Each structure stands twice: as structure tokens, then as C-alpha cells.
Amino acid sequence: MDYKVKVAQVIEQAVDGKLSQEDILAKIEKPKTLNLGDYAFPAFVLSKVLRKAPQMIASELVEKIDQTGFEKVEAVGPYVNFFLDKKEFSKDILSEVLSEGSAYGNQDLGHGGNVPIDMSSPNIAKPMSMGHLRSTVIGNSLALLLEKVNYKPIKIDHLGDWGTQFGKLIVAYKLWGSEEEVKADPINNLLKYYVRFHEEDVNNPELDEEAREWFKKLEDGDEEALKLWKWFREESLKKFTEVYDRLNITFDSYNGEAFYNDKMDEITDLLQEKGLLKESQGAEIVDLEKYDLNPALIRKTDGATLYITRDLAAALYRYRTYDFVQSLYVVGQEQTNHFKQLKAVLKEMGYDWSDDIHHIPFGLITSGGKKLSTRSGRVILLEEVLDDAVKLANKQIEEKNPNLADKEEVAEAVGVGAVVFHDLKNERINSFDFNLDEVVRFEGETGPYVQYSHARAMSILRKAGDLELDSDNLEISDPEAWQTLRLLAAFPETVKKAVSEYEPSVVAKYAIHLAKAFNKYYAHSRILNDDAEKNARLALVQSVATTLKESLRLLGVKAPNEM
């Protein structure tokens, strides 16, 4: 049962419909402290209609409200505070979580509508750095959240698999590379060749000319050039997939930049037909002055198309292919202007579906407030960070529980999960500092702390033995359980909020609050005591385990049963 709706209904009856249930729902608040009740309604929203002081309205409402199902309803100043019947509430919430299991919190907001999500998008022949983490894990969590409320997410890894760098790479490979080296370690060796090309071309400018020729061959469909390009792409993708597997992420499409090579002419033709292309200093632009934006540069003076032309082709292709209800681009906030231009050009082309395109921006990962990189300025590789996190997790497991079965598997889940959780607990628009020792701690507001809380709940259930929970005996009178019960009830609303704000941090913060409340309850209660409420207490533990596990799943984090 949605208790907020119940509160709104009794208020609506008490004010004889002078305020709609929808308006009442929008005004109902959750008091910050439990002594002020579970819900509060500010009576001053009625003072204009009723021409009375808010305090008087609050007192009169308390007299009129049907208090059935509430422990009490009282006026405190201009507020009407509602205290829920704790036994009824615990019975309702626990039976709902127990019966629905991992489906608890599922909703039908999306009606099965398609939502392509452009995310991750590393460059071929370059390693995935920590810079790729945010787009990858935010995009994945949004996909899981959208799926929970019945959208159909389509995860697209828009690979950086085209550009003049491939001419350089082909030249470098032919001069200094070998098939064996590429197969043994594709990314690092391809990067090594590329770096050497730039070192050598300082004294050999003819290398640049050769690279341009090879890229021209690639554009013209030369068999050897295409074969090498495809091979570099495949070998790189194999390596990326190893990282994605560790993050438990799969994609529905790997269509990258190259896929749209034959789709850009249509865009320039359409812009021409609609009279939107204008010449400016030899280049072709779309004027976006009415949107307070700089002109969108469509084609350079040498006839080469640009990044935005490719993105226009991708947007049109995705609309035609998926008939999307929303289309998301999980890309850093430095690209905000680019996406404003993209939407404005599509709008000028007459495509109203451009309103359903959303840029999901995010901040940087920093170290000591500066952009994350090693002392030498080298990028920090994502795979190395995951390895280091797993080692730290392993060390802590050895200290806390050396006899744990499947230690390596649990350390992988905890280490990788810690890195993902730390990213997602931060509001995505904010930049945040990354310190691995802080991230992989089992205490504080961390992923391992939430995982450990789930494992603790599972341990209690194992100690209870093969207990068949009685769904008719779920009343808890213990006030220590109240905060945990209230948080369990808030899970569906949390999911809804995270989806509407495209904000996984809402779920991560919720998981931390639920874990804290449960651990406090655990410290104060004898859960396995044989008394009339033992069944209800174990039902609460089961419900916490289910909800913590599902919260972590929505973030792309595993929940080990033992730690």
C-alpha cells in the first residue's frame, strides 16, 4: 500500500475536495525526525481557500480526519503530523517484499518503450582509462533502472573506430609491428606503434603523407586497409570485453563512428533541401542564433564532415531503427554545448522527436582536486584500478574471514563493486576525488559496507535454519525496527526518483541508509530470540537482504552471500 496516497485521501475527504488529491500529494512532506511523525501536511496551503490561520486549519483538520489505520494524527503549529500504525505498516510492507522478492519496486512507467543509451565509447587501439568508467557505469545503471520500470533500454557502445589515426596506425604496424605482438596484447602494442609513429614523424614528415594515403585507401574501401582496420577493431573489442565482463556489462550494439560513414551524405542533402546549410568562410554551417548557440559546423573547407554530422546521422538512424521514446547520451559535461547544437539542428530539420533526446552529463574523477593521471601524466588504466581494488579487497577478506569459501570470487565482486559503487554514490554532475584505500573500506559509506550488510542479513537467515516464514505473522512492535521498515517502504519511490532524474546516486545513497538502519537494528535486537515476534523479525531480515541485493543490482554491483 502507498501510505502517502492514504494520507492524501483522508486529507481530501476532510477538506471536502477543496484541494485535489494530486495537489495534496505534492505538498505532503516527510518529517526529518521520527517524533514529528511519518508524514506531515502544511496547513498554510489551505489558508487562502479557507481564509483562516494555518494553525487553526491544522487543529480543525485533526478533528475531521478519519484516523482509522493511524496510530495518531496531531497538529503541531501549522502542520498536521501523521503517525502510522506500526504493526499494520510492518505487516503490509513485509508481506509485499516477501511476496514480490526481487520484483519489489517494479513499476510500469515506460510501457515497454525503447530507450537507446549511448555510453562508454572507448577509442579503438587505445586502453580504457578511468575516464571511461563514469560513462560506462552510469549508462549501465540507467539501463537497469529503466528496465525495472518497464522501458526497453538498448545499450550502444559508440566506438571511436574511425579517423585519420587509423592511417597512422596502419603505417606504424607495417613498419614496426607483428601479428604475434598484436594478438598477444592488442591494445598496448597498437598504442606502442602509434606512440612510435609520433616520435618518428618529427624527423620523417613523409610518414604523415604516407598515413594520409593509407587513410584515403581506407575511405575508398581498399582491401588491405579495410582488413587491417577490421582486425585492429576486433582485437581491441576483445580486450574491451574483458573489462566489460568484469563490470558485468553487455551491449546491444557496437555500432561506432565507422558505421555512419555511408549515412552522412543523407544528412547534408537533407540540410541542403531544407535550406539550412549556409556558407561561412568556405565551410558549411547551420545558423543557430535563435537558440543562442554558435553555428553548427557541418562541413569543413576541404569538404570533410565533422563530429556533429556523424551524430546527426546516428540520431536519425536510431530514431528510424528503434522508434525511441527517449534517447540518452551518457557523455561528460564538457560536451553540453555539442548536444544543445545537435538537438537544435534536428529541431530545425523539423524533427520534433529531438525533444526526447537527453544528454546525461557527468563530472570528472579527480585526485587531490586535479584531473586523475599518474605522476608522469600517463592516464590511469581502468583495468589496473580494478586489479588494485581486488587486491585490497582480498587483503581485507584474509584479515576478517580467512576461511571464507570462494575467496577470489568474493574479492572480485567486492573490489570491482567498490569502484563502481563509489562512482555511482556521487551525484553524476559532480566531480569527485578517488582514493582507492577509502573506496575499498568495509566501514563508512562504501560499496563493501552495503555488501557486508547484505552478507550479515544472509548469515542471520542461515543461522535461523530452514525456516518457513509465516506470512500471517508479520507484526513488529519493536520501535528499533521502525526506521528500517520505513526505508523498505521507500524503495519503489526511490527507484522512480532515480529514473526521473537519471540519477543512480539516489539508489546508492538509499542503499547506504538502509544498510545503516539495519545494522543499528541488528545491534539493538535479539533477532533469533524465540518469542512471538521472531517470525516477523526474520521476515524483516529477509526483506532487507532482498532490497539491498536489488539496490546493488540496479547499480551493477554484485551482492555476495558471505564475506
UniProtKB/Swiss-Prot annotation:
GO terms for cellular component: cytoplasm. A motif ('HIGH' region) lies at residues 122-132. Its EC number is 6.1.1.19. The keyword Nucleus does not apply. GO terms for molecular function: arginine-tRNA ligase activity; ATP binding. SMART domains: Arg_tRNA_synt_N, DALR_1. GO terms for biological process: arginyl-tRNA aminoacylation. The keyword Nucleotide-binding applies. InterPro entries: Arg-tRNA-ligase (IPR001278), Arg-tRNA-synth_N (IPR005148), Arg-tRNA-synth_N_sf (IPR036695), ArgRS_core (IPR035684), DALR_anticod-bd (IPR008909), Rossmann-like_a/b/a_fold (IPR014729), tRNAsynth_Ia_anticodon-bd (IPR009080). Keywords: Aminoacyl-tRNA synthetase, ATP-binding, Cytoplasm, Ligase, Nucleotide-binding, Protein biosynthesis. It catalyses: tRNA(Arg) + L-arginine + ATP = L-arginyl-tRNA(Arg) + AMP + diphosphate. It is found in: Cytoplasm. Monomer. Belongs to the class-I aminoacyl-tRNA synthetase family. This is Arginine--tRNA ligase. It comes from Ligilactobacillus salivarius (strain UCC118) (Lactobacillus salivarius).
